[in-house]
């Protein structure tokens, strides 16, 4: 299974590297004064553009909700100079495949996108989209807490049920495939980056080299299946084959205590969130664990996910599996509520420091944990009944788990022999 996931990383990287479309294309321009043959607003230029055109935007501040419905490139003059201020508006940028089926090959680069009521940048039901080198900040302004209950007045109905704590986060991909979100700074929104299946399956996307920080109400990066399906699971549905690589996720969810660094969640009955890769990220100082995997309802599939090569430090506890001290990674299936066991999870080559518990497991499905470096007092706690293959790990010292000065193991069913005598 690990080799298949490695092949998946190669395939998605190759596929996402070729996002252009052939054919001649014109360039339209925008500047605040509308001089020199340019439009004064981004929306006018985007509407006038033919498919595959480029719209270049000069430095300045533009009070707009930019809706994109055709293939094009939207290029700002750098995020420090080019601002889409969506104060009082739904979104800063809306790549609207939900109302324009088949939308593909859109790129948005070089903007600050701020102050939207909901998502700063929203992508729905579209393919081969690139969102890169943007600063997405201060969005989700509609989030309110009347009577202490979170709500997002005006959020489209296909999002309302599940977006109570974040109003869609800074960047939201729903029903999106073969797309890239890379090199963005996403901060001070309710939540950071969200990949969901509210409007359709999201798969084969690359979330890479983003800095996601100080989003106070929710996770840094959330991969969440909201699919509701009470019958037998069907293949190629939900959230699958997404790669989360090389991101920094820090200090998220601190206001509510509800934010993991990176979260893989199955929220509703029948939700499917499988075959994803979380590799080479840094998760530090978040309110919940650095990486959290939660399955809560019957008929869910949160299987065959790979968590590899991440740097995990100084994150928070998680009440769902019952950890009360800072926790690095947790894998939790609420089997008492009818959730299916989580199977096929591989956790490998991660480095844990500054946690109370490095890895907490609470599922009967079994898990493979190898080639990790545990540097804290409790390396692994098994809170479930499944077997944990924890061979070939480093336990803080060469003596192995529970030796004097080494990390420890708690719970039954954790196999640790042989172990590494040096850090991986």
State where each predicted segment sits:
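Extracellular beta-strand solenoid repeats
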Residues: 56, 67, 73-75, 83-85, ...
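Right-handed parallel beta-helix/beta-solenoid
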Residues: 17-48, 59, 77, 81, ...
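The right-handed parallel beta-helix/beta-solenoid scaffold, focusing on the short coil/turn
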Residues: 26, 53, 64, 70-72, ...
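Bacterial N-terminal signal peptides that target proteins for export
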Residues: 2-13
């Amino acid at each position: 299974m690990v080799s298949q996931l490695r092949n998946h990383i190669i395939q998605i990287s190759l596929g996402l590297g070729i996002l252009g479309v052939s054919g001649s294309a014109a360039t339209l321009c925008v500047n605040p004064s509308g001089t020199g043959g340019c439009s004064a607003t981004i929306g006018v230029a985007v509407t006038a553009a033919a498919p595959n055109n480029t719209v270049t935007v000069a430095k300045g501040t533009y009070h707009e909700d930019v809706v994109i419905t055709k293939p094009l490139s939207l290029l700002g003059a750098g995020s420090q100079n080019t601002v889409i201020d969506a104060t009082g508006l739904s979104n800063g940028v809306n790549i609207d495949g939900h109302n324009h089926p088949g939308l593909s090959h859109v790129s948005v680069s070089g903007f600050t996108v701020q102050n939207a009521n909901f998502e700063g940048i929203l992508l729905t039901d579209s393919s081969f989209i690139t969102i890169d080198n943007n600063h997405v900040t201060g969005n989700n302004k509609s989030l309110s807490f009347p009577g202490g209950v979170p709500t997002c007045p005006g959020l489209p109905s296909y999002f309302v049920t599940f977006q109570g704590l974040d109003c869609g986060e800074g960047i939201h991909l729903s029903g999106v495939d073969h797309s890239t979100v890379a090199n963005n700074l996403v901060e001070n929104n309710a939540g950071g980056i969200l990949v969901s299946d509210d409007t359709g399956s999201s798969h084969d996307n690359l979330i890479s080299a983003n800095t996601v920080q100080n989003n106070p109400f929710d996770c840094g990066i959330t991969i969440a299946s909201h699919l509701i399906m009470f019958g037998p699971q069907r293949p190629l549905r939900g959230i699958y084959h997404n790669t989360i690589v090389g991101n920094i996720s820090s200090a998220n969810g601190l206001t509510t205590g509800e934010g993991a660094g990176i979260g893989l969640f199955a929220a509703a009955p029948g939700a499917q969130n499988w075959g994803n890769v979380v590799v080479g990220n840094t998760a530090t100082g978040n309110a919940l664990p650095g990486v959290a995997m939660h399955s809560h309802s019957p008929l869910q599939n949160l299987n065959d996910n790979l968590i590899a090569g991440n740097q995990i430090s100084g994150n928070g506890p998680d009440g769902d599996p019952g950890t009360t001290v800072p926790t690095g990674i947790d894998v939790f299936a609420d089997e008492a509520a009818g959730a299916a066991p989580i199977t096929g999870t591989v956790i490998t080559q991660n480095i844990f420091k500054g946690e109370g518990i490095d890895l907490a497991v609470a599922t009967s499905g079994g898990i493979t944990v190898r080639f990790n470096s545990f540097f804290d007092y409790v390396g692994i706690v098994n809170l479930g009944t499944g077997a944990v293959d924890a061979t070939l790990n480093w336990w803080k010292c060469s003596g192995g788990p529970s030796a004097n000065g080494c990390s420890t193991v708690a719970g039954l069913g954790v196999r640790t022999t042989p172990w590494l005598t040096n850090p991986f």
